[in-house]
Swiss-Prot record:
Binding site for uracil: 299-301
Encoding gene, per UniProt annotation: UPRT
Native species: Macaca fascicularis (Crab-eating macaque)
Name of the protein in its database record: Uracil phosphoribosyltransferase homolog
Region (Disordered): 1-41
Presence of keyword GTP-binding: yes
Family classification: Belongs to the UPRTase family.
Assigned GO CC terms: cytoplasm; nucleus
Amino acid sequence: MATELQCPDSMPCHNQQVNSASTPSPEQLRPGDPILDHAGGNRASRAKVTLLTGHTHCSLPAELDAGACVGSSLNSESNSGSGDSSSYDAPAGNSFLGDCELSRQIGAQLKLLPMNDQIRELQTIIRDKTASRGDFMFSADRLIRLVVEEGLNQLPYKECMVTTPTGYKYEGVKFEKGNCGVSIMRSGEAMEQGLRDCCRSIRIGKILIQSDEETQRAKVYYAKFPPDIYRRKVLLMYPILSTGNTVIEAVKVLIEHGVQPSVIILLSLFSTPHGAKSIIQEFPEITILTTEVHPVAPTHFGQKYFGTD
């Protein structure tokens, strides 16, 4: 299950329980104190400074200041938000969600896949400037599949009864009908196959949004949806959330077609704190599912995936 980001008002944002024998007890810590964590699989050889925000452990890269990503322009903000910028970013460290206030503002609408070494390796290859296109696409497709499967887990199911080959009655569940996918062209199309691999008959719509050359604002050039999309739950696919402007325009188009924000689940691979915050502020009922929140997003994704870098 994805991790919901919460920061209850009834308790301090920091000083949650830590699974480390060498870590001081919560009573000995003050809000904001760093905790040295020397445990953890392949990362045992390097201590990492961890800030505990709500129920999520957010590790801060050494080269970034703890307040750098909140209320300030990001390195990727110069892009249009289309996720197709040709510039490469420096390989990122662990996820960073900003301060407690950001977590309060975003809340449970932002869900993170549980971090493990497999996901971190895929993220590393995608961010690696020297990775071959073959390795990049292979890793991207694997990460997309993980995000899509967790996205399907957010959809409604209903109980059902089936009969096994031996005549045994088995109580299980099945999807409730009425789901569809919508990809934001062009980088969102990279996620379509991952969705079809999990749902062979699902209908997929498309939106093309680009920045206007004069105003630099996102502009809708094309939109094609299932005719009854207003009755469906929507998996909106866009791998990189930088400014959030492109997604905001896409959601506005969906609303114009009768879709309620509460039935939209945004599937992405990487998000900046600014992008996630902007979307949730505009549409508080939308759900965002991603693998990482970090000030620097790999905005070269679309160009490298489709071989136009």
